[in-house]
Amino acid sequence: MGYKYRDLHDFIKDLEKEGELVRIKEPLSPILEITEVTDRVCKMPGGGKALLFENPKGYRIPVLTNLYGSEKRIKKALGYENLEDIGWKLYRILKPEVPKTFLEKIKKLPELKKLNDAIPKVVKRGKVQEEVIMGDINLEDLPILKCWPKDGGRYITFGQVITKDPESGIRNVGLYRLQVLDKDKLAVHWQIHKDGNHHYWKAKRLGKKLEVAIAIGGEPPLPYVASAPLPPEVDEYLFAGIIMERPVELVKGLTVDLEYPANAEIAIEGYVDPEEPLVDEGPFGDHTGFYTPVDKYPQMHVTAIVMRKDPIYLTTIVGRPPQEDKYLGWATERIFLPLIKFNLPEVVDYHLPAEGCFHNFCFVSIKKRYPGHAFKVAYALLGLGLMSLEKHIVVFDDWINVQDIGEVLWAWGNNVDPQRDVLILKGPIDVLDHATNEVGFGGKMIIDATTKWKEEGYTREWPEVIEMSPEVKKRIDEIWDRLGIE
């Protein structure tokens, strides 16, 4: 059975049947009130339920939050019980095996057909363009949230921001926040490390305007893939097609030479003129749990807004963890593990805890084979895409479960001599990190929490870990039910 959801409407119907969605009929304001309700739900055990606010004050369009905010729902949205299976599919695209014999070529055909079937498909019309607004554009007609009291304004937080490389024409779909500046203007938060920022600076160098489209919704994997740290050569909508095993259908923009999902709820078209001065963007209550200050970013001019007849405004709340992004980050962690293992076969597992905002801590377990192996792995991780922004990398032995914070702290505290096992370096840091003296550049820490060898400067005999004998464990297993312990 193939992927069954055509759009968000299909998905939330299924969630409602399974008791995973709550319809809220009470009128609530998009200014702070919807955030407060969502924040409380996100902090419930397991992430809480998806929330559909049917009557946002002053708007006809309902607001959907916390859609991906549990392990169950993110798995359901992507259509996989084991998310690492998606990673292995991505691995086969990036590192294809070249068939050596005719028989191997024949065996490769079904896989090549699946890849071909996943290529995005442009269609003549889609539901997203059922209603068209050009000329008298007003972004304030959309129930865009102001999330936190000191935010600089209302922000679109779950838009798939679509641009094309001005030189190569390669599409990028990224998840960048957008601040409403005026009824037809947005500030685009293109951080320096992101592909959208590269497109902007290329357009500026070439003296061209950069066309932009923002899609809200679509098939459930689409908002996720916009957040995924894919290599620049991998099209996000192709990746979504690989996940669904069918193509993402796209429609051509009405005022821009870009395509966006035909089954999206809402799309916003426009352009950025790199010759214009940058504008103030922020403050914004971010996923770090702190406000990011005002900074300068490009301004987007909106030329059209299109939407379905019955649109839903999908948005996400970010703030002090845990929030919905805990589960989006967890999905990325699981999906990209196979690619990390390909580059570093000694890696057993890794974990980017949401409490560390994904870029503050990386816990990794390895099969240690030689002195200094932990540092070698840490250096390599810092060379992998956005892993370069990690601030603390802690390396453990293969038998430590890095998903278990109790085991992590036990091994870290017992195995580390700060004078010997800690290395301080400098490098790129996430621009949202407020602890560094310079924006985007600061210190990093590598910690070797593995068992130490004499060649690494350890001069004593390393103690054995306490373990019960297997015979006793087996004996107690056999009689456990008779002990009356519940």
UniProtKB/Swiss-Prot annotation:
GO CC terms in record: cytoplasm; cytosol
GO molecular function, one term: 3-octaprenyl-4-hydroxybenzoate carboxy-lyase activity
GO biological process, one term: ubiquinone biosynthetic process
Highest taxon of source: Bacteria
SUPFAM superfamilies: FMN-binding split barrel (SSF50475), UbiD C-terminal domain-like (SSF143968)
NCBIfam families named among the record's database cross-references: mena_SCO4490 (TIGR03701), UbiD family decarboxylase (TIGR00148)
Protein family membership: Belongs to the UbiD family.
PANTHER family: 3-OCTAPRENYL-4-HYDROXYBENZOATE CARBOXY-LYASE-RELATED, FERULIC ACID DECARBOXYLASE 1
Official protein name in the record: Uncharacterized protein aq_1612
